[in-house]
Amino acid sequence: MFDANCLKLMFVAGSQDFYHIKGGKNDRINALLDALELALQSKITAFQFRQKGDLALQDPIEIKQLALECQKLCQKYGAPFIVNDEVQLALELKADGVHVGQEDMAIEEVMALCKKRLFIGLSVNTLEQALKVRHLDGVAYFGVGPIFPTQSKKDKQVVGVELLKKIKDSGIKKPLIAIGGITAHNASKLREYGGIAVISAITQAKDKALAVGKLLKNA
């Protein structure tokens, strides 16, 4: 079951987001699991598993194994576990949700595959994209961004807080979650529009518990 409260502070990450950690692949995997547990203890409201980028795992078996370990941690702390893009993996793991982008499978196809077994989040980068699927009950929420400049989506044009405002003003009732360059310093600007999703605000933080606390306070 989808509860919009889980969008308050979503941590999005994969092992590639720990590129600053010395060592190899296993060190990055361990760093992700450690950071996730700390973030869960500090009360993030959901976790999205995202393997993308130069240092992302490539072997499907390794990806599934890591996803499973992340899912177990989420279950331990009672937080929803969401898989980014990989619909088949999300179904195999019986994840709580799956998040897809505009470049992925057609949203109608995702809905047909999921058969309401897990909730679906959809990334939108324009008002038109949001309006086009506003009527689809199978889409639980919209991910909107990048709101601010970000390292993890260098190729994407920044849409700014303006897009959140446009979507809200258009009468769209679906819950929104903002992503892209969000920090404890700018999170409060987004509070009236919905939840926030962060990567580096947690992965790069020296004190992850403190970072989560500040984000929650401002979200």
Curated annotation (Swiss-Prot):
This protein's GO CC annotations: cytoplasm
UniProt key word Transferase: yes
CDD domains xrefs: TMP_TenI (cd00564)
Key words of the record: Magnesium, Metal-binding, Thiamine biosynthesis, Transferase
Cofactor(s) annotated in UniProt: Mg(2+)
Catalytic activity as recorded in UniProt: 2-[(2R,5Z)-2-carboxy-4-methylthiazol-5(2H)-ylidene]ethyl phosphate + 4-amino-2-methyl-5-(diphosphooxymethyl)pyrimidine + 2 H(+) = thiamine phosphate + CO2 + diphosphate; 2-(2-carboxy-4-methylthiazol-5-yl)ethyl phosphate + 4-amino-2-methyl-5-(diphosphooxymethyl)pyrimidine + 2 H(+) = thiamine phosphate + CO2 + diphosphate; 4-methyl-5-(2-phosphooxyethyl)-thiazole + 4-amino-2-methyl-5-(diphosphooxymethyl)pyrimidine + H(+) = thiamine phosphate + diphosphate
Any one GO BP annotation for this protein: thiamine biosynthetic process
NCBIfam families in the cross-refs: thiE
EC number annotated for this UniProt entry: 2.5.1.3
Chain's role: Condenses 4-methyl-5-(beta-hydroxyethyl)thiazole monophosphate (THZ-P) and 2-methyl-4-amino-5-hydroxymethyl pyrimidine pyrophosphate (HMP-PP) to form thiamine monophosphate (TMP).
Organism encoding this protein: Helicobacter pylori (strain Shi470)
Protein known as: Thiamine-phosphate synthase
